[in-house]
């Protein structure tokens, strides 16, 4: 039988496994919210550790917290930050919308670990109390939003942006490598005028570059922190200067540019910054969906598709068709993008649900945001390393497409006019002949003139 100890809260005593650091409120949450399997994301757990350490440092500096207690809280919080106590954060996402249970989970774990460090009895709340000491100058209403912003900003900066830059570099390299390969363009999925394969991939690279810039542009607002607003934004029970000092400490711990939010009422009641940054991520997902689709369609075949690109062959593609290989990286990436689109709908709705002085959809916002960041970052690296870098052009097929395209007739607009050119193209399409055969045979111009005007390499730039 598992050994237990007694923990207490305002509802009375409750048994907790003796080897677990959490206390009564986390234990009650385990019983009250048996919903799903989605645990509180580890980046949020780390961020709660950062908040508790920063708050202890600020309270110590302001003379509110005994130095010995503060030092021990900081030591225990560091273990949370380092991931050493992850097993002691068992709560699911689906809990109170303020994140109170997860905040108390952090308070209790740090309290009991600090008590253990000081040689005390876990569950006694002495000499380190989860509310009076670990949660000093704080409310769940400002602590969880602060942790949410820290977690999301850290993941964007350290995981998402580097992954997107990795993809951008690979796409830009292909654009430079293929700058002289002329291919036929397509609009409305139909043949259009020529461009180079490098220009096409240069467009993809620019989409990702723009996406990176959009995300970076949103970060200053995401890095504004609610801490110091306490229950409703007034800062009740937080000493003067606490908000500014705790933000400074958080910036120091993370190495990121966190600041105190200029208006704590907005910071508690609305999470527009979360919606805004995720909107930029959603836009990147839209870009990635387009790029992944183009690449898999251009690589369709190998015998009966467009066949302009040869995609890396990573694994067998069919359990029934021998030799079949599929564009699996594009398929994985587009599924990720679909998930991000759904997450953005959730975040948009949740962000609108600030009722009076508090938004109570915090955990689901954090969960969906962090899932999007993790998925896009991982998928961008996978798509780059397992697809983009190994793509090769099928030059013969590309050349054949250019030679057979009727849209080269556009080069004759200036000499023959739109109507005559349209007639040449339609006749060639109807008869299964070439533009040259119809233009020269129909007496529109000589063979030499056709050679002079219809030059694909002259059709890939203005003029």
From Swiss-Prot:
GO molecular function: fumarate hydratase activity
Catalytic activity: (S)-malate = fumarate + H2O
EC numbers for this chain: 4.2.1.2
Cellular component annotations (GO), alphabetically ordered: cytoplasm
SUPFAM superfamilies per the UniProt record, alphabetical: L-aspartase-like (SSF48557)
UniProt keyword Lipid biosynthesis present: no
Active site as annotated: 188, 318
Primary location class: cytoplasm
Chain positions of site Important for catalytic activity: 331
NCBIfam families in alphabetical order: fumC_II, PRK12273.1
Similarity section: Belongs to the class-II fumarase/aspartase family. Fumarase subfamily.
Role of this protein: Involved in the TCA cycle. Catalyzes the stereospecific interconversion of fumarate to L-malate.
Note: There are 2 substrate-binding sites: the catalytic A site, and the non-catalytic B site that may play a role in the transfer of substrate or product between the active site and the solvent. Alternatively, the B site may bind allosteric effectors.
Name listed for the protein in its UniProt record: Fumarate hydratase class II
Organism field: Caulobacter vibrioides (strain ATCC 19089 / CIP 103742 / CB 15)
Gene that specifies this protein: fumC
């Amino acid at each position: 039988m598992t050994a237990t100890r007694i923990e207490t809260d305002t509802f009375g005593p409750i048994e907790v496994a003796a080897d677990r650091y959490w206390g009564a409120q986390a234990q009650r949450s385990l019983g009250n919210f048996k919903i799903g399997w989605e645990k509180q994301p580890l980046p949020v757990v780390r961020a709660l550790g950062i908040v508790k350490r920063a708050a202890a440092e600020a309270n110590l500096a302001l003379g509110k917290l005994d130095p010995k207690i503060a030092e021990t809280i900081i030591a225990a919080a560091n273990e949370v930050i380092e991931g050493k106590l992850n097993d002691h954060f068992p709560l699911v996402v689906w809990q109170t919308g303020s994140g109170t249970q997860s905040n108390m989970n952090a308070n209790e774990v740090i309290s009991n670990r600090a008590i253990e460090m000081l040689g005390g009895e876990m569950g006694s709340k002495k000499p380190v109390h989860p509310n009076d000491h670990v949660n000093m100058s704080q409310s769940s209403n400002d602590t969880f939003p602060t942790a949410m912003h820290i977690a999301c900003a850290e993941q964007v900066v350290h995981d998402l942006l580097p992954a997107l830059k990795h993809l951008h570099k690979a796409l830009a390299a292909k654009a430079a490598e293929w700058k002289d390969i002329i291919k036929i363009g397509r609009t409305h999925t139909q043949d259009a005028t020529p461009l180079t394969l490098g220009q096409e991939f240069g467009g993809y690279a620019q989409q990702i570059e723009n996406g990176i810039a959009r995300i970076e542009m949103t970060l200053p607002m995401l890095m504004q922190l609610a801490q110091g607003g306490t229950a409703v934004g007034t800062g009740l029970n937080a000493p003067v200067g606490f908000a500014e000092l705790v933000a400074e400490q958080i910036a120091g711990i993370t190495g990121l540019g966190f600041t105190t939010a200029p208006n704590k009422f907005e910071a508690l009641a609305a999470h527009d910054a979360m919606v805004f940054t995720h909107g930029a991520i959603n836009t990147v997902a839209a870009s990635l969906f387009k790029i992944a689709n183009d690449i898999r369609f251009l690589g369709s075949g190998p015998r009966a598709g467009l066949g302009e690109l040869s995609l890396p062959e990573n694994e067998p593609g069919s359990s029934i068709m021998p030799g079949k290989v599929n564009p699996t990286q594009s398929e994985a990436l587009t599924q990720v993008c679909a998930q991000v689109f759904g997450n953005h709908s959730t975040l948009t709705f949740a962000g609108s649900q600030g009722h009076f002085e508090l938004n109570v959809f915090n955990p689901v916002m954090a969960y969906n945001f962090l899932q999007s960041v993790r998925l896009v970052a991982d998928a961008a690296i996978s798509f780059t390393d397992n697809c983009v870098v190994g793509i090769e052009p099928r030059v013969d097929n590309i050349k054949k497409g250019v030679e057979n395209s009727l849209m080269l007739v556009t080069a004759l607009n200036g000499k023959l006019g739109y109507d005559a050119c349209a007639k040449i193209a339609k006749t060639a399409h109807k008869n299964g002949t070439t533009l040259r055969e119809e233009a020269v045979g129909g007496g529109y111009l000589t063979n030499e003139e056709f050679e002079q005007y219809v030059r694909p390499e002259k059709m890939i730039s203005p003029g």
